[in-house]
């Protein structure tokens, strides 16, 4: 219903409306539409494509290092099951926290698969001979910083604290470790070119109040059914919720369908979700996720989706696996 209604509406919506405001392009897990996600190679390719920010998701290792992986699990993006079959937990998963950095270095990072071993995006990277490996946050920061220096560029960091409550239960304060790392690179001030993001509202509050982080924070918004954290996202997706978020965060990262009023959509109308105006009024940056050229809603084009995001939704940017089509749209439409 969402995709069919959205298609009909988008076809009748004028997509080219010039605006002076910037539209941030965030490289989701690096150039993950072209190379295995979160590898240094994916970050390098993303840099070459010149987004505004490159994302790093962060999890902890057994020996206290921070590595860049989207999940606390390893089995869907590496060959860990073949190399360490006896390190599986009772739930059938392999966890980064159970491995030292040296052990993680022996793994080959591959294109993402589901838990049955089927590649999630069938037409993405098929190679097996190039050796992609797990990298640390320090390595990602150094790489992007050096490329910025050499090319006189200013691409920012967009770093996510993954599963802080789970890490805490395992005895790891991942947020403090992240802030310690950022401080070493002077990425902890209010003017630093970085967003720290998290799905856990309690941890966002802790970052600001208890840990004293002065930089920009984004609260990611999930659907309650996903079990992403103990946060009640439905309560936050209201005018009052946006006001509460604005007390601690500088921005929000909603799931794309959350941007539209579903009741209006069922009537064939495109109406921004009621909380969206409040978020803008509160000064929250709005960076929804995730635009994928190879996972568009049925029957819709990239131009239609991006047109909705830039006008009439008028969000501040988007997370994307593929930077070039977003840049091309912005160039052609004068955004």
Regions found by a protein language model. Name each.
Residues 1-21:
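Gram-negative bacterial Sec-dependent N-terminal signal peptides
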Residues 13, 21-335:
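Phosphate-group recognition and catalysis centered on beta-loop-alpha active-site segments
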């Amino acid at each position: 219903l969402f995709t069919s209604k959205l298609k009909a509406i988008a076809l009748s919506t004028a997509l080219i409306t010039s605006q002076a405001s910037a539209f941030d392009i965030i490289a989701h897990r690096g150039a993950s539409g072209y190379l295995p996600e979160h590898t240094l190679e994916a970050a390098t390719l993303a840099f070459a494509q010149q987004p505004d920010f490159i994302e790093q998701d962060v999890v902890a290792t057994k020996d206290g290092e921070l590595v860049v992986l989207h999940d606390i699990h390893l089995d869907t993006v590496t060959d860990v099951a073949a190399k360490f079959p006896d390190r599986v937990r009772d739930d059938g998963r392999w966890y980064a926290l159970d491995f030292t950095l040296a052990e993680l270095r022996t793994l080959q990072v591959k294109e993402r698969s589901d838990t049955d071993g089927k590649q999630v995006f069938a037409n993405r990277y098929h190679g097996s001979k190039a050796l992609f490996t797990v990298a640390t946050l320090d390595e990602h920061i150094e790489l992007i910083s050096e490329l910025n220096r050499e090319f006189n560029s200013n691409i920012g960091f967009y770093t996510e604290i993954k599963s802080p409550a789970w890490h805490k239960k395992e005895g790891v304060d991942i947020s403090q470790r992240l802030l310690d790392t950022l401080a070493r690179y002077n990425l902890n001030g209010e003017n630093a070119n970085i967003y720290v993001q998290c799905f856990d509202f309690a941890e966002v509050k802790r970052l600001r109040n208890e840990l004293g982080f002065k930089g920009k924070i984004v609260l990611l918004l999930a659907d309650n059914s996903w079990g992403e954290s103990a946060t009640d996202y439905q309560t936050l997706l209201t005018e009052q919720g946006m006001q509460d978020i604005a007390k601690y965060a500088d921005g929000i990262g909603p799931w794309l369908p959350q941007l539209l009023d579903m009741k209006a959509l069922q009537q064939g109308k495109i109406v921004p979700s009621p909380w969206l105006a409040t978020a803008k009024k509160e000064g929250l940056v709005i960076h929804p996720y995730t635009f994928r050229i190879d996972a568009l809603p049925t029957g819709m084009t990239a131009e239609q989706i991006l047109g909705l995001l830039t006008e009439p939704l008028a969000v501040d940017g988007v997370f994307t696996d593929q930077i070039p089509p977003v840049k091309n749209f912005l160039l052609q439409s004068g955004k």
